[in-house]
Design a protein with these regions (language model features):
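Short, well-structured N-terminal submotif of metal-dependent ribonuclease cores
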Residues: 1-45, 57-68
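Short, hinge-like loop/turn segments at secondary-structure boundaries
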Residues: 60-64, 96, 132-134
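A general structural signal for well-ordered alpha-helical segments in protein cores
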Residues: 30, 50, 66, 86-89
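Histidine- and aromatic-rich ligand-binding microenvironments
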Residues: 15-16, 45-46, 98-99, 120-121, ...
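Acidic catalytic patch
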Residues: 52, 74-95
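Acidic, PIN/NYN-like endoribonuclease modules and their adjacent C-terminal/linker elements
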Residues: 1-10, 76, 106-134
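A generic structural signal for short hydrophobic patches within well-formed alpha-helices
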Residues: 20-21, 50, 123-124
Length: 134
């Protein structure tokens, strides 16, 4: 009997808040994030990113645009960390001197086995990060 070849599961992706904002506002690095953002079936969105992107869009583009982006983000899988992962994020923040949001978002990518797409240079030495510098 011939062996059945299974297709490998596509890798999950996570685009951080700055990446979302870069894409939806047509920034110079928007193309870097496009493939991951348009592949909604393999894209995870930390709940924290909903807040960060929503707030920035409200400030810079108003409620209608903010809500449109909020809806777009929810077409993907919105995820949250388990309590133990928050502790790991705190340790990572201390060890690597990361801001709280950066540590939580990086830990989310790690917990879900996703590649983190970012333009945040503070994450350049972290595992599982695909960086496009600003």
């Amino acid at each position: 009997m011939a062996a059945v070849k299974l297709k490998p599961e596509p890798a999950l992706a996570l685009v951080d808040s700055c990446g979302w904002l870069e894409y939806v506002t047509g920034g110079t690095n928007a193309d870097f994030f496009e493939k991951a953002l348009l592949n909604t079936g393999n894209l995870i969105v930390p709940a924290l990113c909903l807040y960060e992107v929503g707030k920035r869009m409200l400030i810079t583009h108003g409620e209608a645009a903010a809500f449109e982006v909020f809806e777009m983000m929810q077409r993907s899988r919105v995820v949250q960390l388990k309590p133990a992962d928050h502790f790991l994020a705190a340790k990572t923040s201390m060890t690597h001197k990361l801001a709280m949001a950066d540590a939580l978002i990086w830990q989310t990518a790690q917990s879900f086995g996703a590649t983190l797409f970012t333009q945040d240079a503070g994450l350049k030495h972290m595992s599982g990060v695909s960086l496009q510098p600003k």
